[in-house]
């Protein structure tokens, strides 16, 4: 692996084609307009990575990536990979619910273990608190090494309770990986006429798979090996995982598992935006630096649009805290779209149709200060365009918030928003 350390002056900048100043807030709902291409097609992906990604981030070139929408698209691909596994399966998830989807995955994992595949499953004890213990015990009896991340204990205090494993990683045979916002639960692929939670998963083949597997193994060993064993491993050279596989495509990816590095990647890309910043966030309670970066981008004439929950969130208190930011953001020219088809759970962003990120990181306090997270970050025109098209399509199922109408909301609603904003760090 080699870290790309391009200088800021080393990237030839071009005037964005078709760029437009931020318009006055639209009075009627409508899709986010497509402003066209920012970069010349001749600009290399390596130069784009140098421009949009902080210098300290290691970018792995040569990946093949596919964007999967909701569990309806992601689960069949994940299950097929598990059923084809021959050597190893690593599954890390916040929620492993013992419903129809959980049973389906459990059966596939157990069958893999029974045919000799080395299967490790790490689920978060709090995120999966409703799941039956007998389900996981049944997996163990069939050969699956399944363990809970930090079961709650009163003796360990609230800080231990807040530090959760929020990652979603599946790595099979060291050759294919999946990461994004989708857990293992029927929320993302309901039976009958139910509406799936809106989310995204990135399927990866290539050198970046190694990095996701390495992150999984580091967490596993941190949690379940004694201190002496961990010390010996550090002396021998750290966490081992299969060497990176051959190149499968042309996408450069950085795998970020530090909370601060993910936050820094967001800020860096927004500050360098030239035409558009499109963020889909199921949970959005931004810190001051992110608010300032978004407002500054809008003042520069960059199109800034947010896709947020619209009254159907699984965390309604957090949604009220989010609305405390609306006037400030819309007053700066930022457009806000509220998702109307069920729960929005996505954690994606795309800048200039080039830089993008998909992962588990939410733009709120728990992800920034406590949780274990992982995001894939890329600078690729094809994948960026695909993510941007998905965002713009989703806006067709949204209600755009009108600033004048929003200001006339009831006084009690304003009071609730302010109170919950005050407690935003613990929601």
What are these regions (language model features)?
Residues 2-5, 10, 14-427:
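Charged, low-complexity intrinsically disordered terminal segments
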């Amino acid at each position: 692996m080699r870290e790309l350390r391009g200088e800021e002056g080393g990237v030839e900048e071009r005037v964005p084609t078709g760029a437009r100043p931020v318009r006055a807030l639209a009075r009627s709902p409508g899709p986010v307009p497509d402003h066209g291409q920012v970069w010349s097609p001749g600009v290399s992906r390596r130069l784009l990575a140098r421009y949009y990604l902080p210098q300290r981030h290691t970018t792995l070139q040569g990946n093949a990536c596919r964007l999967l929408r909701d569990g309806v698209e992601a689960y069949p691909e994940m299950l097929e990979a598990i059923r084809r596994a021959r050597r190893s399966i690593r599954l890390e998830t916040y929620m492993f619910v013992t419903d129809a989807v959980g049973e389906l995955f459990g059966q596939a994992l157990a069958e893999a273990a029974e045919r000799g595949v080395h299967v490790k499953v790490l689920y978060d004890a709090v995120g999966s608190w409703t799941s039956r213990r007998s389900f996981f015990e049944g997996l163990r009896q069939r050969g699956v090494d399944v363990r809970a991340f930090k079961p709650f204990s009163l003796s360990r205090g609230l800080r231990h309770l807040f530090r959760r494993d929020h990652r979603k990683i599946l790595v099979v045979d060291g050759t294919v990986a999946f990461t994004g916002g989708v857990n293992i639960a029927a929320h993302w692929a309901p039976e009958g006429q139910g509406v799936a939670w809106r989310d995204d998963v990135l399927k990866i083949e290539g050198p970046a798979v190694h990095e996701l597997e390495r992150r999984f193994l580091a967490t596993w060993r941190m949690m379940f090996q004694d201190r002496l064993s961990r010390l010996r491993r550090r002396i021998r050279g750290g966490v081992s995982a299969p060497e990176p596989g051959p190149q499968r495509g042309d996408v450069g990816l950085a795998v970020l598992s530090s909370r601060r590095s993910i936050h820094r990647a967001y800020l860096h890309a927004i500050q360098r935006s030239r035409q558009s910043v499109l963020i889909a966030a199921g949970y959005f309670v931004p810190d001051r630096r992110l608010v300032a970066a978004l407002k500054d981008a809008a003042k520069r004439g960059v199109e800034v649009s947010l896709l947020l929950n619209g009254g159907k969130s699984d965390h309604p208190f957090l949604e009220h805290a989010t609305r405390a930011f609306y006037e400030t953001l819309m007053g700066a020219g930022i457009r806000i779209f509220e998702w109307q088809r069920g729960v929005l759970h996505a954690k994606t962003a795309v800048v200039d149709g080039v830089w993008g990120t998909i992962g588990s990181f939410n733009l709120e306090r728990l992800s920034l200060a406590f949780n274990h997270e992982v995001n894939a970050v890329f600078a690729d025109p094809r994948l960026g365009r695909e993510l941007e098209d998905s965002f713009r399509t989703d806006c067709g199922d949204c209600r755009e918030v009108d600033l004048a109408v929003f200001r006339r909301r009831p006084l009690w609603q304003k009071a609730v928003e302010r109170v919950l904003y005050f407690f935003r760090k613990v929601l």
